Amino acid sequence: QGADIIAVIRTTGQSLLDYVPYGATTEGFGGTFATQENFRIMRTALDKVGEDVGRYIRLCNYCSGLCMPEIAIMGAFEGLDVMLNDALYGILFRDINMQRTLVDQYFSRIINGFAGVIINTGEDNYLTTADAVEAAHTVLASDLINEQLALLAGLPQEQMGLGHAFEMDPALENGFLLELAQAQMTREIFPKATLKYMPPTKFMTGNIFKGHLQDALFNMVGIWTNQGIQLLGMPTEAIHTPFMSDRFLAIENAKYIFSNMKNIGDEMEFKEGGIIKTRAKEVLNNAIELLQKLTSEGLFNALEKGIFGDVKRSRTGGKGLSGVVAKGSNYMNPFINLMKGRK
């Protein structure tokens, strides 16, 4: 139908499995099990369709949860192009222990970097639990943290799909300008990153006509500010799992706007002292202030206080801490140097 990337959602709850299921599966709840065989089946199917339509179609899946390195390896083996890999998402939204997650994200990102897989981070999720206007600076701060952790893992900036979202209340006066400010600011701060831009979900009501308009405004911001990966919004968001016809309408919406407004970003400049520049400076300054606070307090303390997404987590709580052990004096993982040495 025209999409460049197909993201296959995982079955509900797989993040919390401390093992990877084996083989092809025929059922799932809200998604499909991430197994190596399923990855192979998906990749083979997309390659066949790609031959028919004359272009390569990228495949995206998820290596978040309690098996980040294991699923990253499976994705590398089976030719996945994009994988969800966030340093903080599992802590905040799946209650996975913060020590476990930060260890796992490091090695899994080394694998992603070595395999040429683009990672996507999940800052958009903060705006489903916190207000998109008030919490905008926490999204930027998290993007910067995710970027630095990815660099430590040897991941090139071009493989960083740092996340943010179009999630402000549509009733907000000049909300489009504030969304535009956020997107342009993010693009300028991360000029090489393949930014991941998420569509409106929080304020989708089931009114498919208004929803299609909200998605159109989102697509306008995306092409205007040259976002890297545009996750398409569905007109039936908040009603049911999208039909193929809904996906077709979403692709048609995006292709129309992306073509019709292709070079708008090259033609427009932002007014000094105007709403957009003023908003971007405000968000940036608040993010800097937050990061300075984190420098003195530490990341774990910030997570315990609920600074990100208004979600509080304990450093010794959550799932998976029993899988974390201190490195012995003779510990060695040869793959870390081998994989990072390639870059």
Predicted stretch roles:
Residues 1-166, 171:
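Catalytic alpha/beta active-site cores
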Residues 32, 61, 135, 169-176, ...:
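Hydrophobic alpha-helical scaffolding
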Residues 95-105, 235-262:
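C-terminal helical cap(s) of enzyme catalytic domains, especially alpha/beta-barrels
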Residues 39-53, 179, 183-190, 258-261:
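Surface-exposed amphipathic alpha-helices with a cationic face
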Residues 68-82, 142-145, 176-183, 219, ...:
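Short, electropositive alpha-helical surface patch
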